[in-house]
Amino acid sequence: MSYPQAPSKFVNPDEIIPLSPPTKPPFAQYAASPLPATPHTPYSPPSPSRLSETIPLRPYLSLLPRILLTFFSPCLLPMILTIAHLIQNRSSTASLATSLKSSVLSACSGLAKGAASIKTLPRYLAMQTNQEAIRATQASILAIGTMLMDAITIIEVVVNFIVDTYRSLLLCTIELAVRGTLEILISAVQTISDAVTDTLNSVRSNIQDDIGDANDIIQTAVSAINRVTTLVNLNISVPEFSIPALSFLQNVTIPTTFEDGLITLNSSLPTLTDLKKKMDEIIDTPFEALISEINSTRLEMAASFNSSILSVPSLSSLSANSAKDLSNDLCSDLDTSLIDDTAKALHKLSSIAIGLMFLLLFLIWAALAVWEWRKWKLMKDTVDAVNEEWDRDGKSDAWRMVAIVEHPVLERYSGTFLGKIAKMPRTRTNLRWFLSYLAHPTCLALLFISLFGFLSIQFQLVALNALKAHAQSSANSTVTASTNSLVTKLNAAALNSSQEYADSYNEAIAGYQDRINNELFGSWVNTTAITLNSTLVEFYDEVEKALNASFGGTILYNPINTFMYCILGSKITNLEKGLTWISEHAFVDLPTFPSDILLLSNDSMNEIATPIAAAAVGSGDGGDDDDGVVGTLISHFESALKVERTFYGIMLGVWLALFLIGLAVVIWNSGGRENFMALRGVPSSSSPPGYGPPESKHPRWKAWLTNNHPIYDSYAEKQFRGTTPTNCLESYTHADVPNVNNGNDDHEKSFFKMRDSHAAGPFGSHATSAVRSTIASLAAPGQSFLKLSGRKLTDTTTPYDDKVPLAPVQTSEKYSRDHANSPFPRPSSESSESSAAQPFWVDKFYGAFEGVKSFFPTRSQRLGAALARKASQRTEGSFGASQVPTARTPGHDWIGGHQCPPEKKAEPEWSMVDPRMLGRALEDDKGRYPRVLPPSEMAAANYNPHPVYPRPMSRAPTLGEGMVIPSTTSHPDPFQDMPPLPPKHKRASMDYVEEYESSHSRSSREDSRHGGVTSPASSSVSYFAAEPQLVSASKVQVGVAQKGGQATRALAEIVKELQEKRERKDPFGDDYERGL
């Protein structure tokens, strides 16, 4: 059975230097060399082929499975769901359109049934109309009869008046003619009697002739009257005048008998009274008979005109077949095109949206595939870099690896971006956390689902609003056309019944109209008017004949004839014209019904049909509740979209809530907690135990005056004045020194820490390392002053202050370099009091003034220093050029036993630097110059403090060996060569935090990266690890007690460097600040 071979370690061919020895220990551990770096050649050996090897599965997903899973990425799932919703809405819209058309047809069928009822409406309208028509017609017949009777009565009176006028005129004419003539004759006889006798003969003959003529006239008149009275069977006889012989007149005078005869004739003329009575009877009898006949006729006609002669429409239109036929007629061509057009527009809108969503889905999937490939490549390169760094540094950080695996792209590209927008490491760390929070799959899925869904629904609503506006604009014309169609069809359905009814009614009215014209007006016109006209004409003819017979041939004929025409002839002529007009217009025209008598008017039909048409296609007024089935269709589609938009809006609101929560967390951890605690006056509890602000009895702005401030280091380095005891440590508990390469450091640059190029060698920059150390020590008072005044260069504490608490050892320094890292309570600097309550500006100003004033020793301090110098004595324990021992005060100079000084007012005193570097143990059995153990060994060996002599302020000790303090930098041995950095062309840093910002100046940070070579007065790292030691007169051995290699420098360089340090100006002067 063969076991799979473990895959060989992959070697990047770009990192192989051809023609160079193999990288084996110890060369692989060295990064510093006096020679320049060996250049890379373009030659790269080919990598071994792996085509024949079988690649087994890994416990992680490779690129192909990741690309396969992008089909169901959280970015694509919302689009797939949205497409499914669009398809479902499209199908539901089509089905809804079909159901709405069915609803319209059903409504039309209901309208047909209603129209069938409307079709029967003429029957009931005809019945009511018949009643009113009968009543009106009967009243008209009675009124016409009454009018005729009144007219006949009037005509009768007028005819009587005319006949009486004619009669009286005739009698007056006769009276005038006969009596006048007789009067003339009588007068003439009397005249003739007085005349000559001879003329009597002629007179007698004339008289006889005249009498004969008069007899003829009378007889003629009587004959004419008798012709008139024959109508009433009346005959008038007038005797004739006898013609006398008048023989006696011959030769006789006129006798009186002639005159008497004339007078008798005159008195015997007729008066025509009988004629008047006969004329009245002739006229009155026919008129009375005519009035009676008209009256009876009108009553009989009015009574016979009733509902029996008028027909009404039948109820046969209520049958089912008629309703079905009417439904087919009304609904066969009903306009439902607007519903179809709207459904097609919605379907087209949904199809376009679905197509665009599919296209967008494909594009996003392609982008996700490219993104996944890029993320996989970046993660693979990052893992390779992390593996190389772990192999080189021997450290690991699993949480950094988690961040890389979760968000490799953020880890790769966020460092540069965050470095531009945020200068504080804590802010960059918080922003990196915020980006990881937002890039979590849950947040991403929620964002993409809500955002894509909301935008797609909103775009559809915008298009739907345009479609809705178009549908509303065309609704008015559709409603008008539908209403006109329905009105026309409804009127056509009722027109037949109305036509039948109107025809039957008009026929009945025509029959009665004929009866009225023939029976009422016909008898009167034919009987009365014509007869009366004939009678008048005949009467006037007879009168003329009588006048002609009486006065014809006489001088009175023409005047009498003219007189008769004026009085009687013109009246008879006008009466004839009147009777002729009555005969021509003696008829009536009764009103008839039109064919649409039973149809509703257009306004009424519109009132009936408009709500039905509006229910089918909408009223077109744009109202929310009156859009008809088209509005229902659009509202259904719109309501479904609005519900989905609300759902996606809620999801987007949830994502915004999560965004605000994450932003609040970032703000809270970026200074919000400290500001909140400061406002409440409560100290922040976020600092680690033992690193919070101390409970000091002095004001906070005077804290730097205590014996724990690095200002005393500068004074001790410039003016050495003996020793005073440090604070008593009653009990000591060993504090483990943690690994200086702590990978979980919050202020670490990235998941791997790129070293500075100067840190590769044991000394870095040979000419400037000590200078930078001294600059860092001199900058410490300025830093403290800025902290004191409430201003600080950075709010980030150094890793040496926060993460590397060293074990306290005995020292005679006023301020030990281990004090900042002590696990015991200490006065907190401004960097550790960021969350404490800020002082008022008055306190700040007063503290700053007092702090500047305290930079310089007071007069009492200078006098005390002078007295101390005079009190010093030389002993054999002294060394160096001065041979001045330390001024001792029993119980105060040495640490040990139970001697603890009482609390004193903080005053500046001069002390030496840390005595652990080089000191002389006077009471040790192992010799004058015993070897001082490291701190860890001193703590484990029950180290007892021993008195030592302080050394002068000389950088060149007199011993060839001495105590070496372990380095507190990120590497155990500052002289050990570090592995080479990764090539720049392979990858860039995945950092999201820029280079570490300490609370000290820029020079102090640079010194911390160069093996920890700093000034003894610096409180951050150890200077003594690289302290030069005298070996011979011309050489100085450096780093004797280190495990790594060693190096030497010329003594002249050391002396020159020390001389530069001595000649350096006051660190508190302006020149020094300009030099920085």
Swiss-Prot record:
Keywords: Cell membrane, Conjugation, Glycoprotein, Membrane, Transmembrane, Transmembrane helix
Membrane-spanning parts: 67-87, 139-159, 351-371, 433-455, 647-667
Annotated Gene Ontology cellular component terms: mating projection tip; plasma membrane
Glycosylation site list: N235, N251, N266, N295, N306, N476, N496, N526, N533, N548, N602
Lipid bilayer topology: Multi-pass membrane protein
Disulfide bonds: none
Keyword Signal: no
Cytoplasmic side, ranges: 88-138, 372-432, 668-1076
Composition-biased stretches (Basic and acidic residues): 997-1010
Places the protein is found: Cell membrane
InterPro entries, A to Z: PRM1
GO BP annotation list: plasma membrane fusion involved in cytogamy
Annotated region described as Disordered, given as residue ranges: 1-31, 796-835, 874-908, 949-1020, 1057-1076
Comp. bias (Polar residues): 874-886
UniProt feature coiled coil, ranges: none
Extracellular-side positions: 1-66, 160-350, 456-646
Main function: Involved in cell fusion during mating by stabilizing the plasma membrane fusion event.
Family: Belongs to the PRM1 family.
Protein name: Plasma membrane fusion protein PRM1
Species of origin: Cryptococcus neoformans var. neoformans serotype D (strain B-3501A)
Underlying gene: PRM1
